[in-house]
Amino acid sequence: MPKKDGAIEIEGRVVEPLPNAMFRVELQNGHRVLAHISGKMRQHYIRILPEDRVVVELSPYDLSRGRIVYRYK
């Protein structure tokens, strides 16, 4: 997985789906963030359901929002 420069990758669990392909994700450290699906996952029609384990990429500028870049099988 290519990583964006300066982005922080952390594992989490999807808590609830929200409209417009957004999800509330609980990170390993207990924080909850708002995350959207990355473009490549959208292109390949990867479905994300509640309770899925995912990898979230957080920007160092806004740690309350992120991008889901991987869903564990």
From Swiss-Prot:
Q: Name one GO cellular component term.
A: cytosol
Query: Could you give a GO molecular-function term held by this entry?
Result: rRNA binding
Question: Key word rRNA-binding present in the record?
Answer: yes
InterPro entries membership: NA-bd_OB-fold, RNA-binding_domain_S1_IF1, TIF_IF1
Q: Where is the S1-like domain?
A: 1-73
Compartments, as annotated in UniProt: Cytoplasm
SUPFAM superfamilies assigned: Nucleic acid-binding proteins (SSF50249)
Q: Which Pfam families match?
A: eIF-1a
* Keywords tagged on the record: Cytoplasm, Initiation factor, Protein biosynthesis, RNA-binding, rRNA-binding
Q: What does this protein do?
A: One of the essential components for the initiation of protein synthesis. Stabilizes the binding of IF-2 and IF-3 on the 30S subunit to which N-formylmethionyl-tRNA(fMet) subsequently binds. Helps modulate mRNA selection, yielding the 30S pre-initiation complex (PIC). Upon addition of the 50S ribosomal subunit IF-1, IF-2 and IF-3 are released leaving the mature 70S translation initiation complex.
Indicate the quaternary assembly: Component of the 30S ribosomal translation pre-initiation complex which assembles on the 30S ribosome in the order IF-2 and IF-3, IF-1 and N-formylmethionyl-tRNA(fMet); mRNA recruitment can occur at any time during PIC assembly.
Query: Which protein family is named in the record?
Result: Belongs to the IF-1 family.
Q: What is this protein called?
A: Translation initiation factor IF-1
Q: Which organism is it from?
A: Frankia alni (strain DSM 45986 / CECT 9034 / ACN14a)
